[in-house]
């Protein structure tokens, strides 16, 4: 761009100089002597005709077929192999220059087929012998009528995607450009495997354009891009470009967003807003242009309905449920007087949709794909100037409905990172001393990289990270923030797997109608995203467990406030699958109706839309309208224990107890039902891990109560407004600690049945489909450690300790849950009372402290010493650090007294553990702190400092 600017300046200087010279000539001539005119003027020779500036248009497009549309495309017939099939000429009307267009890209073939990819607001601009695809910065409002406009344009100038050479001009003056090369370059990053030796480069000579279509308002170009690898192996990826004319400004009325209602937003900054306003940022709701065709009618069809086409790839047996999931949202629009806001069509081989391309941005498709991962996603594209949604496509992976016997390491690095969010993984990378046992720093770094820039979705189901990838390529992509990468179906697939096991234990199977209900729920969830709605992870905390069971068994009412939560299947220990009325929430809930009202309700004729929206959003303090989304549920940094994934009911402790009861019932006789006589034993291993992973991960809901604070989005002027943050009652936090102490921190929470543990071999298949495990015997200790370490970190992490400590100033009650109490109680839970063994003499086979308890204690001490030895203020306040240090000093003293008085009654393993723990505590707490010059006053703790003449201590 700098070169083009320099060229413009040079051209301006040359033109100015010539104009100046021409204007000066008459003035100079007036002062010069006038020569007499000759009698006759000899004939001057005529200059030779200049060659044409551009090649002849007809010659350039000879043998090419024109395809008129938004712009005219010229290409050779596909069957003519004598021609360059990568050559694609485009005649761009001059009237289209500098007009706003949407360039949307999609993956049409390959592992990510069906994914919406990158999209841009673009403009065509002629610059010399080039047509540039410029990308204006849509974040900033420009208005030529405002005096600040020049400053805005100068500061936030355009970027560009590519420059296309002009090859000729059409007879009407339109430039004709070569677009084939730039599109095959390509214009966006492609989903290709990464890693050593996996770099891929595009090969134009091997690439093609399988499909090109031009329409009056859009052009679709499908490219098959060949990619060559360093090792000689290659691959191809289908990438579809769709250029689309954007609606005229003024044809759609943007709607101001409100943080109390969960919508995706389009955010713009307007520097012309008055200085008296608190912000110069405008946030628009992302929504369709859906309104009554006749506003005078109580019930009217929409002026522009939203049309979804179910792709013919959707299996026949599930089409009914897919259609019902889409149409479910019509109920919310009907309450606003709009009938048939959403229209569902079915694509077949011979109807009017037979040849419609799902990548065509004019159509909204529900697509069926087969990646092997089992997920669904509902992204949409919105006008970056107004938030008007223009296009949406939902993809549904077939594997969602297939129960695979895979090992799901729910507490491995990837799934833990997925569950806890990017802030948690960043914390572990920066403070590796807090990495739980069973993880490595490299694994955490890999997990952190996989979460970078995932758009709306900040973390997944805990099971998601344990899923296989396809062709070595991760299925997550850095999507445009206006879209969502939703992993509801990934986690729900694990819910189905668990339900499958529970039903199989009773000798039955899940009826197809319940599978259909799950499909309907997932589709409704993803369609909600395409309507503009974000996740609402508070919706499942609306009703009590008793009310949920009553509704499930006797009514068709919603079981949760919104389908935009990650809602679990509703199956409890003792349920008879054949007698259930519902298996999952059957319909949209009250929050969904309310959110659609905010986004799509029209003000009465002559009414004040701002006042109408305030009246709607002002109801947010109602229990059924509570809202929390992705950024409210990012693990250790999230305060609200009512915002969770795959929980149910208003009581996390009761819900966790129900899930543990179900898991215990399955574990009791697992060998009798998990594997049939002719099935391999590794099915038993995967079944056991699935049940145990669910049992342990359900403790997450309980641990979040400790240090919890309810976050309310209502405003102070709303009816029945609550404080923005409400501390949980101390009694409730103590109940949570009591439950954790009696469950996941006890040995008997984990199955120690030797016969079972000796019957859990891994699969030994060594092929592309399998994930071979090198260790054949079952890693019992590692499995327990990973589950306990994660639960422990949720109680003693610096974030939780600091939050509990700060909360002491936020309550005037006599009874407070303090940081001192938390530190003391957790230490007592893990270590208990280190009393003398009495008359008991422990042996190596029957130790005083079990191996499970020793590992838990070791992890606890590691966490607490990491806090104690950190730089004051780096992890927690100095006051908290003092408490952590003193707690460790007390523990060291208790261990010392026990060792001194045991008189040989303690077994070898316990004695080694206690001795090493005391030594570690004493060495860390008594290490000298040295002030090092040049390090800004920081401290370095030297452990095991040698003695010598040069030793200096401070």
Where are these regions (language model features)?
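Bacterial N-terminal signal peptides that target proteins for export
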Residues: 2-15
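Bacterial N-terminal signal peptides
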Residues: 13-24
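Sec/Tat signal peptide C-region and signal peptidase I cleavage site
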Residues: 25-29
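Auxiliary tRNA-acceptor-end handling modules of aminoacyl-tRNA synthetases
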Residues: 30-314, 332, 336, 347-510, ...
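Zn2+-dependent metallopeptidase catalytic core
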Residues: 97-98, 317-341
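Short pre-active-site segment immediately N-terminal to the catalytic Zn-binding motif
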Residues: 314-318, 505-523
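The catalytic-center signature of Zn2+-dependent metalloproteases
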Residues: 346-369, 517-524, 529-573
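Conserved catalytic/binding loops enriched for acidic/polar residues
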Residues: 458-493, 509-514, 539-954
């Amino acid at each position: 761009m700098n070169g083009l600017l320099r060229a413009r300046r040079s051209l301006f200087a040359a033109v100015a100089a010539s104009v100046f010279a021409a204007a000066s000539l008459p003035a100079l001539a007036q002062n010069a002597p006038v020569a007499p005119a000759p009698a006759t003027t000899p004939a001057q020779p005529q200059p030779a005709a200049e060659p044409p500036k551009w090649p002849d248009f007809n010659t350039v497009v000879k043998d090419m077929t024109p395809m008129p549309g938004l712009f005219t495309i010229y290409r050779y017939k596909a069957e003519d192999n004598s021609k360059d099939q990568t050559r694609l000429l485009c005649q761009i009307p001059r009237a289209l220059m500098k007009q706003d267009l949407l360039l949307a890209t999609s993956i049409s073939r390959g592992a990510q087929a069906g994914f919406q990819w990158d999209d841009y607001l673009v403009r065509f601009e002629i610059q010399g012998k080039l047509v540039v695809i410029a990308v204006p910065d849509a974040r900033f409002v420009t208005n030529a009528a405002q005096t600040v406009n020049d400053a805005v344009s100068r500061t936030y100038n355009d970027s560009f995607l590519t420059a296309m050479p002009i090859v000729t001009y059409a007879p009407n003056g339109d430039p004709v450009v070569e677009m084939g090369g730039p599109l095959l370059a390509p214009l966006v990053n492609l989903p290709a495997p990464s890693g050593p030796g996996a770099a891929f480069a595009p090969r134009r000579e091997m690439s093609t354009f399988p499909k090109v279509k031009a329409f009056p308002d859009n052009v679709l170009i499908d490219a098959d891009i060949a990619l060559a690898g360093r090792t000689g192996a290659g691959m191809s990826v289908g990438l579809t470009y769709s250029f689309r004319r954007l609606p005229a400004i003024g044809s759609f009325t943007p709607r101001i967003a409100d943080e109390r209602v969960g919508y995706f937003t389009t955010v713009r900054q307007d520097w012309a807003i008055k200085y008296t306003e608190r912000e110069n940022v405008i946030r628009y709701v992302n929504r369709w242009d859906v309104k009554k065709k006749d506003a005078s009618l109580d019930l009217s069809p929409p002026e522009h309905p939203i049309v979804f086409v179910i792709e013919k790839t959707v299996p026949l047996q599930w089409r009914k449920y897919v259609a019902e999931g889409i149409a479910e949202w019509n109920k919310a629009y009907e309450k606003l007087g709009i009938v048939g806001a959403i229209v569902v069509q079915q694509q077949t081989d011979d109807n009017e949709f037979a040849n419609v391309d799902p990548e065509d941005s004019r159509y909204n498709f529900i697509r069926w794909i087969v990646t092997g991962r089992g997920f669904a996603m509902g992204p949409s594209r919105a006008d970056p100037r107004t938030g008007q949604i223009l296009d949406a496509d939902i993809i549904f992976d077939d594997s969602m409905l297939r129960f695979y016997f895979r090992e799901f390491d729910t507490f491995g690095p990837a799934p833990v990172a997925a569950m806890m969010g990017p802030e948690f993984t960043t914390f572990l990378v920066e403070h590796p001393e807090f990495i739980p046992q069973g993880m490595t720093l490299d694994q955490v770094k890999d997990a952190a990289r996989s979460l970078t820039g995932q758009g709306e979705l900040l973390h997944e189901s805990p099971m998601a990270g344990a899923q296989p990838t396809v062709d070595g390529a991760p299925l997550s992509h850095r999507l445009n923030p206006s879209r969502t990468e939703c992993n509801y179906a990934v986690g729900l697939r694990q819910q189905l797997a668990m339900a499958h096991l529970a039903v199989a234990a009773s000798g039955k199977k899940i009826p197809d109608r319940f599978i259909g209900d799950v499909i309907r729920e997932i589709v409704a969830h993803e369609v909600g995203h395409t309507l503009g709605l974000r996740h609402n992870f508070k919706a499942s905390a609306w009703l009590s467990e008793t009310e949920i069971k009553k509704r499930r068994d006797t009514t068709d009412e919603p079981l949760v406030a919104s389908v935009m939560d990650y809602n679990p299947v509703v199956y409890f220990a003792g349920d008879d699958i054949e007698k259930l009325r519902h298996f999952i929430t059957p319909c949209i809930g009250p929050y969904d109706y309310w959110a659609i009202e905010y986004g799509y309700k029209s003000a009465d004729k002559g009414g004040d839309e701002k006042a109408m929206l305030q009246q709607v959003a002002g109801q947010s303090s109602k229990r059924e309208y509570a809202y929390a989304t992705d950024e409210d549920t990012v693990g250790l940094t999230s305060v609200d224990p009512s915002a969770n994934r795959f929980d149910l009911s208003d009581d996390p402790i009761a819900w966790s107890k129900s899930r543990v009861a179900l898991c215990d019932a399955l574990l009791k006789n697992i060998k009798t039902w998990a594997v049939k006589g002719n099935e391999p034993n590794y099915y038993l291993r995967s079944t056991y891990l699935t049940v145990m992973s669910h049992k342990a991960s359900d403790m997450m809901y309980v641990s979040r109560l400790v240090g919890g604070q309810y976050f309310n989005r209502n405003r102070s002027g709303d009816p029945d407004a609550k404080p923005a943050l409400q501390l949980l009652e101390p009694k409730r936090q103590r109940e949570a600690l009591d439950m954790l102490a009696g469950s996941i921190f006890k040995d008997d929470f984990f199955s120690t049945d030797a016969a079972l543990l000796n019957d859990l071999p891994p699969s030994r298949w060594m092929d592309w489909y399998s994930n071979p495990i090198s260790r054949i015997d079952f890693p019992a200790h590692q499995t327990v450690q990973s589950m306990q370490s994660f639960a422990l970190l949720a109680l003693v992490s610096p974030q939780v300790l600091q939050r509990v400590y700060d909360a002491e100033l936020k309550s005037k009650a006599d009874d407070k849950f303090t940081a001192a109490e938390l530190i003391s109680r957790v230490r007592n839970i893990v270590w208990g009372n280190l009393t003398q063994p009495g008359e008991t003499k422990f042996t190596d086979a029957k130790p005083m402290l079990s191996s499970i308890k020793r590992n838990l204690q070791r992890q606890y001490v590691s966490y607490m010493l990491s806090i104690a030895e950190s730089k004051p203020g780096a992890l927690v306040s100095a006051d908290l650090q003092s408490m952590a240090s003193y707690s460790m000093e007390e523990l060291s003293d208790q261990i010392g007294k026990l060792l001194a008085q045991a008189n040989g009654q303690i077994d070898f393993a316990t004695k080694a553990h206690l001795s090493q723990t005391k030594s570690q505590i004493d060495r860390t707490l008594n290490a000298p702190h040295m002030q090092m010059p040049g390090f800004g006053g920081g401290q370095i703790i030297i452990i095991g400092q040698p003695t010598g003449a040069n030793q200096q201590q401070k």
